[in-house]
From Swiss-Prot:
Protein name: Protein DETOXIFICATION 22
CDD domains listed in its UniProt record: MATE_eukaryotic (cd13132)
Gene Ontology biological-process annotations: xenobiotic detoxification by transmembrane export across the plasma membrane
Major subcellular location class: membrane
Organism: Arabidopsis thaliana (Mouse-ear cress)
Gene: DTX22
Sequence intervals crossing the membrane: 40-60, 78-98, 123-143, 159-179, 188-208, 217-237, 268-288, 299-319, 340-360, 384-404, 416-436, 441-461
GO molecular function, one term: xenobiotic transmembrane transporter activity
Amino acid sequence: MAGEGGELTAALLKKTTENGGEENDELGLKEKVWIESKKLWVVAAPSIFTKFSTYGVSLVTQGFVGHIGPTELAAYSITFTVLLRFSNGILLGMASALGTLCGQAYGAKQYHMLGIHLQRSWIVLTGCTICIMPIFIFSGPILLALGQEDHIVRVARVIALWLIAINFTFVPAFTCQIFLQSQSKNKIIAYVSAVTLGLHVFFSWLLVVHFNFGITGAMTSTLVAFWMPNIVQLLYVTSGGCKDTWRGFTMLAFKDLWPVFKLSLSSGGMVCLELWYNSILVLLTGNLKNAEVAIDALAICINVNALQMMIALGFLAAVSVRVSNELGRGNPEGAKFATIVAVFTSLSIGLVLFFVFLFLRGRISYIFTTSEAVAAEVADLSPLLAFSILLNSVQPVLSGVAVGAGWQGYVAYINLACYYLLGIPVGLVLGYVVGLQVKGVWIGMLFGIFVQTCVLTIMTLRTDWDQQVSTSLKNINRWVVPESRDANQISSEE
């Protein structure tokens, strides 16, 4: 089987590379940049919009819960910030392995393999989600151990049980998004997300304000908002929207699960270490003395930074698709060029936002607060916010290159060293020992991100893209299944 798949893939890659090279030779640099930019934005724009919409669902829920009462708001915030973000990081990270598999298979025109990879990822992520469930079931003791007050924990335990159902939405959400992104078909996700956000506002008002159902109403609307786009995505994938890449359910999805799990695990490590890093910033600053105003200002800065991260994560998705597609095609120059265009596009946006936030300084805080003291503190922190935005315009893109090329295991070790062995210790020293408080912790963590970005930049610049194509070819050969074995696998065995 491997030999047959290898010969087929090698022949296909040779043909595609030759054709791609001839086409590229006839184009000038401006035309190449324009064509690559269009391919990049086809994936990036819907991805960015989808992430804003999904983030908006949580903000809408938070707003309505805040009108129920301060205890409910505190309980909602802690469960979403600590529990859901923890599971979200694990599942998003593990799902990113699908980007490598689907992207390279699509580039190599092994279209039938995308559906098999998708189903394997469903199995792996569903098993992982079940393993995470005890965190939500026993959320009470966990939150008490983190120092939360009893009256908040009592409400948080109820919300945590609702989050179990929301947690399972991440399985089809992340996998179907990546499956569609690999084919540049993710516009449908953006449309559905926009409609869902509007409906969520209406249902939240109806259940929380009009019928006064409290937390039950807010969480019911949130659950519907999380599940609705997933149902549409699943119907789109399985009902004819992806005829070339979805050939039906197959028993082959249950084979070769261990290699998929290992790749998913390394991907999970890479992404988790990044997502949890920002959460640790909040935990560390929360223990500083006399830092109430600074922490309020930090919360505003983190919210602004989170919104900018939606753009960066959109480019992460786009460049991972472009790099994996070109490697699958056997086009090393295309993968390299896609990386360059993505980095410079994202960096250009980051530079604009960098100067905007340096200019706005404390004025941005009045969107969130009327406190003059908090505004002054935001102005003091604004240079750090601006540099965070600048670094976040490059670092996620390089992580996207790693996903597209399948370097997740290496980047996980880089993240561990730069973030947790370098950034956090430096932040602790500057914040607690030197006495720089919140600024010191943030400077230390920015230092970790800067070092990580430098390492990833050097790693990308020194990449032998021809060798990377050979590695991708070997991976494709290892995973490939002849189409004849895939077709109607379940029905034939029955």
